[in-house]
Structure formats: C-alpha cells, structure tokens
C-alpha cells in the first residue's frame, strides 16, 4: 500500500512549456515554432546536463542559463547567440514564470490528498531561491509542510542521485517502500526514485520515448493531467486494487 506521495515541480505541478513558449516567441520570433514541443524537451535536456556543473562550482548560474538557451537554438539550426541575447531571454522567461499557475487537475489531486491526510512532499532540482519562489507562487505550502520541501542546490545532491531521495525519506519521515514519487523526467524522476528504493509514477505528458534498450523501472505511466487525478484516487481510495505491487 502506498502511504505517502512526493512530487517534482517543473512541468509536473504546472505547465512549464507555456512560459518557455511565450519567451521564445518574444525573443526569437523567427524561430520555427512548429518545433516548439521538441525544443522545449531539448531545453530541459540541456538544463539537466548543465546544472551539475553549477553544483560543482564549474559554471555560474548565469552562464549555465545562457548555455542551455544557446545549445537548444543551435540544435534546431538557429544562429548562434551571444550572452547578452541569452541573458535577455532568461529575463523574459523569468518574467513569464511569474505568471505560472497550478493546473486545475493538479489542484484537484492535491485537494483530494489533503482531505485524505496523505503525507506529501516536494523534491526539485535547481537553484534554491528560484525553485522556492515557484513553490510559493504555486501555493504548494497550502498542501506541503515547508520542512517537506527539498531543493537540490541546498543539499549538494540532485536527482537522480539516491542521496537526495535518502535525505528526503529521512527529513520527510517517509518509508521509501511505501512512498510514490511523481515526475515528468524519466532520467531524473523515475531513475532517481528507483535509485532511492522508492516507487514512481512517470508523468509522461510530453510523450517522451525511452532510449532503445532502456528497461522501464516505473510502477505507473500516465500521459495527461486528466489521468493524474484518476490514478491517484484509485491508489488511495482502493488500496487493495494492486496498481502498484509492494
């Protein structure tokens, strides 16, 4: 039986592609917007690849943000941009992030869990101040105790490292074997949960494909916000219906 649940933030609690798309349209109007979904996925890829260098002290956060923007654009045949242009994109992107809201289906899911008194938590990769600002903006403190929110930069670890999941299990007072982690990234969220001995739900609403030869290690896969509420409701309303084998 699953007794507790922990969520990723970016592109799980809210639609992160929306602010990215608006920033791209404003800053690079000649970019082929038909590639937007794939460009966003690659932007997230470069975020995952580059941020460890910030954690290691090799790059500044500012350079990392410029680099992920530049590399994404180059991959889609766009001209190489300079740091000033990249910094402007980041400013516009951050401004658009001020407008993020929790989607109705996610709010319905969290309301249900709160009503059921299910312990909840948050594990998110990224710069501490930046991520906590999102947590507050999204109203997550209405559902999650601040002591059950972990941002990677503040710990020295990051998803998919098992250490951040071990730390969360201890800090949140949750049993990994009965805790479900929900996130959109297979590499960070699903593999991270697996590494930490947690269960996982892959929230694959961007339609990502696994690399050839990859053995799936998630317990459940859903592909829309609409499916999220139904899956969570079944887990906690009908615990004897074994969607997840403990």
Each model region followed by its residue ranges:
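Asp-based, Mg2+/Mn2+-dependent phosphohydrolase catalytic module
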Residues: 1-5, 111, 123, 127-243
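N-terminal helical cap/lid subdomain that shapes the substrate entry/recognition surface
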Residues: 2-9, 13-104
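Internal, well-ordered alpha-helical segments in soluble enzyme and binding-protein domains
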Residues: 65-68, 109, 164
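Generic recognition of short, well-ordered alpha-helical segments
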Residues: 18-22, 104-108, 133, 162-163
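Catalytic-core regions built around general acid/base machinery
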Residues: 105-118
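Residue-level marker of alpha-helix boundaries and capping positions
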Residues: 60, 100, 122, 180-181
